[in-house]
């Protein structure tokens, strides 16, 4: 259910884009993201930090898109989010005692420190590459291609990378944890 909620604003954005235009889609994205945030608070009494950060960026970049009637702002939002994710992972890698990935998953999984570090770095690189791909597609290709890439391409890439990360984790888990 929670994963569905995370994708709901993206689905709403895509539907409004196909029916109306980028500006209606942006307004719908802001509203849908707010509704999901409110629902998460009411239902689970908790809002994830990343969901809150994403909401703030959606409101800021979406608001700028609507105010200036310029779709470049909403296109930049994707890259800014990925840059923040990558930055947080890299800072945790080099400044904190534990990589961020380990802080998020370390209670459920027992892995060697080197595996946590490689996984954390791999996700940082993934987010950097996705952000760069977004810049290229957003500003060098037609808007409809960017929307499709944002909705389907980045989602598919994230699911594939998550699957590959799961395989990598499984290969490095202690034998007793694999069952």
UniProtKB/Swiss-Prot annotation:
- UniProt keyword terms in alphabetical order: Cell inner membrane, Cell membrane, Membrane, Transmembrane, Transmembrane helix
Q: Which Pfam families does the record match to this protein?
A: IspA
Quote a single Gene Ontology cellular component term. Answer: plasma membrane
Q: Which family does it belong to?
A: Belongs to the YciB family.
- List the source organism: Escherichia coli O1:K1 / APEC
Locations listed in the record:
Cell inner membrane
Please give the positions of the paired cysteines in each disulfide bond.
none
The lineage's top-level taxon is Bacteria
Q: What is this protein called?
A: Inner membrane-spanning protein YciB
- Record membrane topology: Multi-pass membrane protein
Q: What does this protein do?
A: Plays a role in cell envelope biogenesis, maintenance of cell envelope integrity and membrane homeostasis.
Instruction: Give TM regions.
Output: 22-42, 50-70, 76-96, 121-141, 149-169
Q: What is its main location?
A: membrane
């Amino acid at each position: 259910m929670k994963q569905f909620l995370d994708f709901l604003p993206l689905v709403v954005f895509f539907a409004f884009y196909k029916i109306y235009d980028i500006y209606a889609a942006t307004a719908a994205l802001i509203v849908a993201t707010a509704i999901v945030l409110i629902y998460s608070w009411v239902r689970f009494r908790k809002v994830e930090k990343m969901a809150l950060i994403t909401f703030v960026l959606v409101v800021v970049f979406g608001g700028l898109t609507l105010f200036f009637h310029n779709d470049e702002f909403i296109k930049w939002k994707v890259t800014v989010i990925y840059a923040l994710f990558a930055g947080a992972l890299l800072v945790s890698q080099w400044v904190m005692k534990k990589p961020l990935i380990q802080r998020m998953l370390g209670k459920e999984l027992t892995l060697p420190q080197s595996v946590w570090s490689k996984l954390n770095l791999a996700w940082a690189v993934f987010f950097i590459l996705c952000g760069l791909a977004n810049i290229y597609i957003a500003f060098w290709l037609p808007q409809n291609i960017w929307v499709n890439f944002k909705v389907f391409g980045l989602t598919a890439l994230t699911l594939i990378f998550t699957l590959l990360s799961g395989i990598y984790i499984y290969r490095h888990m202690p034998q007793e944890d694999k069952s």
